[in-house]
């Protein structure tokens, strides 16, 4: 059998083709396919182009596409129609990218427990797979969420620099401000037009500088980390109070590449935070394989 999985996040989209034993047959990475960022037409175009290239030797038996921002409603219907039209004889399913994470958990076959996934990349969201099905808590997008994403880290840092530039007594030579100005190549005020043009992905690209400054002992970077992990911990507490039988949270996203982020969040929750040692696209393939059973 030929099993295809797609993991479409806010920054990149991974495509994986494997057999029923998990043997990798083909893999490729393209850009963002989040329809809220690139538009649904560009999203569908990228997904169909990538899947066609991935499966150039023949149609897959099953496909699961987990798409950030495209898991529900009209967007999900458009994606399903496009993939089904491309491979009309294949079993096709699509949903939010969090499904990929959930299928990276060893507990996915334990029907007595629920599995939660926490995504902290460009954006952030919590998803839960339980006897009630799959549902989301938080993850309303950068206009309405208030912390815990790469966008939030970058925005918090840039907002602090903008504020400091307007205060004559501010020290602009701190590790965090120095790193931000170096990346911007100009003052934050002069960079405002380019920040708005770059939008959410560009602002999120400043998040790693917070951790770099943190390692240099910058107190503002420490407070940004603390604020954002406080918000995430409170969200996880609400989810646990609602669901009850969750003891493991599968985690993914660029922020988890920073050990300080995982350490800070872990210290604020009694849930076990599990960062899988496989790519989320592997979870997409596992979900696709289940469609054939």
Residue ranges and their predicted role:
Residues 66, 95, 250-252:
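Solvent-exposed beta-strand sheet faces enriched in polar/charged residues
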Residues 68, 146, 254:
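Glycine- and other small-residue-rich loops at beta-strand/loop junctions that grip anionic moieties
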Residues 64-71:
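Polybasic, low-complexity association/targeting segments
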Residues 1-62, 82, 86, 105-116, ...:
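ATP-binding/phosphotransfer module of carbohydrate and carboxylate kinases, centering on a glycine-rich
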Residues 71-172:
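Phosphate-binding/catalytic loop of phosphoryl-transfer enzymes
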Residues 31-32, 69, 138-141, 214:
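Short, histidine-centered active-site or binding-site loop motifs used for metal coordination
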């Amino acid at each position: 059998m030929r099993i295809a999985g797609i993991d479409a996040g806010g920054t990149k989209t991974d495509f994986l083709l494997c057999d029923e034993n998990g043997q990798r047959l083909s893999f490729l990475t393209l850009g963002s396919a989040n329809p809220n960022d690139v538009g649904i037409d560009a999203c569908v175009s990228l997904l169909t182009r990538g899947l066609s290239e991935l499966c150039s030797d023949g149609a897959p038996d099953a496909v699961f596409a987990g798409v950030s921002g495209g898991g529900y409603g009209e967007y999900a219907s458009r994606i399903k129609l496009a993939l089904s039209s491309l491979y009309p004889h294949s079993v096709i399913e699509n949903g939010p990218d969090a499904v990929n994470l959930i299928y990276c958990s060893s507990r996915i076959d334990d029907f007595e427990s629920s599995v939660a996934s926490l995504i902290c990349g460009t954006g952030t969201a919590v998803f839960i797979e339980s006897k009630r099905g799959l549902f989301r808590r938080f993850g309303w997008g950068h206009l309405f969420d208030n912390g815990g994403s790469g966008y939030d880290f970058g925005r918090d840092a840039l907002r602090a620099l903008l504020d400091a530039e307007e205060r004559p007594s501010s020290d602009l030579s701190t590790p965090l401000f120095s790193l931000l100005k170096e990346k911007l190549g100009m003052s934050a005020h002069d960079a405002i037009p380019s920040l708005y043009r770059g939008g959410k992905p560009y602002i999120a690209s400043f998040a790693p500088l917070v951790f770099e400054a943190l390692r240099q002992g910058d107190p503002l970077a420490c407070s940004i980390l603390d604020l954002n992990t406080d918000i995430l911990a409170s969200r996880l507490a609400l989810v646990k109070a609602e669901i009850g039988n969750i003891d493991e949270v599968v985690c993914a996203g660029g922020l988890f590449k920073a050990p300080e982020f995982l350490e800070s969040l872990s210290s604020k929750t009694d849930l076990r935070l599990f960062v899988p040692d496989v790519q989320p696209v592997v979870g997409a393939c596992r979900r696709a394989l289940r469609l054939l059973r």
